[in-house]
Amino acid sequence: LKVKILRKENDTPGDYGANGRPARAYKTKAKLYLALGASLDENVYAPYMLTSPYTNSGLANTASYFMEQNGLTLYEARTNTTQENGVLYDSYAESDDGKVLEYELYPQLRETGGRATYAGVYGDEFKNVDYKDAYGMYGLYFSYASAMNSQSVTYYNENADAIAKILVKSIVRYFEI
């Protein structure tokens, strides 16, 4: 398992352009783009994962399964019955008139999936036009806690090492490394 961290300390690259995180990942020929973040939803009390609705939820489902098997809690939500607990599809963007578009909201998923997720063809994302025909990476957004829920932050702080170890185990198992 090779891991490449796409930013340096005090470096905050965005999701667009030649120096953005997706561009850095494409240049390294990454197979997986793992984005970590925190939710701002005060109702979220435990970690959850987002995947692209244009791809499968296989890795996230594997992580959910192993976390449950190891006594870890995920936010009890899922997009559909083919997904495990704590696994959601990203939402679609809407136009100014409320029409649902074919583009996802999270650039960490949309801009890393290449042509499968419409990378480089929406709004500011034209800065990633070089990747609109790329095969892309498997994108996974792992929301480790809610910044608006102290119970969620406490749970993460108490279980961060176990969550990280199970996430790595899931990646190794899913990709058969």
Task: State what each model feature region is.
Residues 1-177:
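Active-site-proximal helix/loop segments of hydrolytic enzymes
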